[in-house]
């Protein structure tokens, strides 16, 4: 979860949907609040075992690594999965890990901020 917008993560920790401030993040797909009654809240609470706080630089670095190695674009929300994997590299060593990279919806300005 981006540190700049950790509304879902903080809500999960509290066991209820919170209305807290969210700052801008490259991960616009995970940004913002969680609507009351949203089905995603219960699904996340029931299925997510571990969460990771990510700095904007970690997300952008992970996105750049993916773009360089895979020669494909990805959006910031997908970059959080790679950033979390990199951050937990030692902890996950020797384990089978799968992540889903979907979404290439990134603005030119956001892309520039990643590759510059």
What are these regions (language model features)?
Residues 37-94:
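Active-site-adjacent helical/loop segments in soluble small-molecule enzymes
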Residues 1-46, 87-88, 92-93, 97-116:
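Glycine-rich phosphate/pyrophosphate-binding loop at beta-loop-alpha junctions
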